[in-house]
């Protein structure tokens, strides 16, 4: 599923940021990169989204974006878990409400 090279590459790239950078900013950047990557490579997008929530576990937007990416991969149960965490952090965030709608639509299609 995930190649060792991709994981190693992401670790090497992220290590300096995790040590010295603003974790919320890093989390947001990773989330945006994950969304962009989801158009080309869903596995890399999922890795980036996981890194975004690790970088800042209190970032509701990162959890919501990760949920969207997992939903794109047709992993409804993971998307729901990401949604639950995002809602727990900030239930009023637009990204959280958007993810809720996407999940509801996916359930209706099943």
Language-model features, listed with the residues they occupy:
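Alpha-helical tetratricopeptide repeat
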Residues: 24-35, 60, 64
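Register position in tetratricopeptide repeats
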Residues: 39, 72, 102-109
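Conserved structural position within tetratricopeptide repeats
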Residues: 51-54, 85-88
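TPR alpha-solenoid repeat register
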Residues: 62, 95-96
């Amino acid at each position: 599923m995930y190649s060792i090279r991709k994981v190693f590459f992401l670790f090497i790239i992220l290590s300096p940021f995790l040590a010295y950078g603003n974790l919320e900013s890093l989390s947001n950047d990773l989330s945006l990169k994950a969304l962009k990557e989801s158009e080309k490579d869903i596995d890399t997008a999922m890795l980036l989204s996981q890194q975004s929530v690790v970088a800042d576990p209190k970032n509701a937007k990162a959890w919501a974006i990760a949920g969207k990416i997992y939903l794109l991969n047709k992993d409804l149960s993971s998307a729901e878990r990401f949604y639950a965490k995002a809602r727990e952090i900030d239930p009023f965030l637009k990204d959280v409400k958007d993810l809720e709608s996407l999940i509801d639509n996916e359930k209706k299609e099943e």
